[in-house]
Structure formats: C-alpha cells, structure tokens
Curated annotation (Swiss-Prot):
MF (Gene Ontology): transferase activity, transferring alkyl or aryl (other than methyl) groups
Family: Belongs to the class I-like SAM-binding methyltransferase superfamily. CmoB family.
Protein name: tRNA U34 carboxymethyltransferase
Enzyme nomenclature, EC number: 2.5.1.-
Organism, scientific name: Nautilia profundicola (strain ATCC BAA-1463 / DSM 18972 / AmH)
Stretches of the chain forming a coiled coil according to its record: none
Catalysed reactions, semicolon-separated: carboxy-S-adenosyl-L-methionine + 5-hydroxyuridine(34) in tRNA = 5-carboxymethoxyuridine(34) in tRNA + S-adenosyl-L-homocysteine + H(+)
Amino acid sequence: MDINKVLKERQKWFEWKNIKPIYEKIVQWQIENKQLNVKNVKLNDIIEITLDENKEKLKEIEQIAKMLKPWRKGPFKINDLFIDTEWRSFIKWNIIKPHINLENKDVLDVGCNNGYYMFRMLEMNPKSITGFDPSALFNLQFEFINNFIKSDIEYKLLGVEHIPFYDKKFDTIFCLGVLYHRPDPITMLKELKAGLNPGGEVILDTLIIEGDEEIALCPVRYQKMKNVYFIPTLKALYNWIEKAKFKDVKFIGKRYTDLEEQRKTDWIEGESLNNFLNEDLTKTVEGYPPPLRVYLKLKN
C-alpha cells in the first residue's frame, strides 16, 4: 500500500461541500493570525488557552469554533469561550495516565479525534506524537486548537489498517474506543502490533460485556450505532489478544460510561448517551447491557 498516495487522495476530502467552507475559513484564519498573542496554555483536564486579543478577534474565534461542531472530545477553554464537548475526556485520561510513561518515546494515537489526548500527552515529553483519524472535520478541529498550542504533533487522515504500511514504528500506540467498530478485531490487534517497536506497548480501551464465558455480543445496533461489530467478555478479549500474539496483558481498570462522562451539550448536534439508554440507564435502548469499558496495556 502506498501511504503517500492514500494521503494525497484524502486531501480531496477537504473539497466536500460540507467541509470546504470550514476548511477555507480555517486556512484563511491561520494565514491572518500567525502572530496571535497566546499568553498561556494549560494542559489540564480542561485544556485552557489564554489570549491577549481584542473582542473582534475573540468573536471570530468563537464563530469558527461553532462552525466546527460537533465537538466530541475535550473540553477546551479559550479565554471566556468554553467548548463543553460531549465527552469529558479527562475521565478516561485520568484512568490511563498513572500507567504510562511517554518520556522520549514515539507515540501514535489511532482514532485521535480532535487531538485532545495528544495534547494531554505533551506534558509527558514524548519524542514525537502522531495521530491517525480518517475525519476531515476532526482534523480541522485539531488544526484550530493547535494554532494556539503550536505543537509538533503530526495528524494524518489514516486509519488502523494503514499502520503496517506506515514508514515509522512506535513505542506506544493508543487505541481508545476503536476495536468494537472493526469487523475483524483480531486482524486489527495484529495491525496495532505491526506498528510497534520491539518492547513497545498498546494502550487499549474497548467495550466489553460482563460474564465468565469466552463469548462476544454481535448486535445489529448497539446504542443506536450500526458500526458496532463485536463486544466481548474480558476472557474473549484476552483470547483475541493472545491470537494476535502479544506477549503480555496488564489490566488497568474498567468503568461504566455514565452521564458524567458523556452527555448532550450545546456543542454537538443530535443525541447522546441519555438517548441511547433506557429510562433507568440499566440497558441500551436495544435491551443490551450498558456500555462498560476496559482499559488494558498490551506488550509487544
């Protein structure tokens, strides 16, 4: 597979009629605002950016942020503008953070969305950070935020299937909330492994169901999503990982997704978690167990 050819083809995505106006606005805004006066950046649970700019500039920033909806991962704050994203992504990050060391490592985040987790990684002083996500909109959200942070993070319009063909290997690969969207989870785990340096690790977050059997749920829809293929028990997931030939697995934790972590805000369109569960939040609208996520560290 020719990755450069793939990337060149995907640049055409910015010409899509729903993306082109936003893309052109972002490009023009970046050209006109190369010298934005960024006073401070705090890479905390809320990524806070403080600017010393006039009201007109700040109003334009707010308009662009609203053009970029829906905002899934975050939150972000730019002066008084609070981008209250659907997910409070720091909840997941704070589960993972005590179990990782990214100092001087080459890091990949697969399914990186708008880059929230990559921005949080910066405080750990990695050697490099690369993000893969085949979404033009999320890429533009990243470019918007990175215009203030000015990191060296590389964002590629690629997916997990491109990892074995990419011209770089990584010490740590983050794969958060992707596995259940793939029709062949064992192949995907092998693709992640193919992207690791010797001794490298994958930080994996995925949906599971409770139970002692080595089985997986295969729903037509799950939380109204058509693109959920398999949700295994933990034992079945460990079997997948063994079949993908990882040497070791460390259990980090598990957590039910709740309305503290994911909810409807003014920064998304449509529905959120409360619309995907029944009234007492004990099952999905389809009658399946509610979303339970497990966090694992896989060693190459």
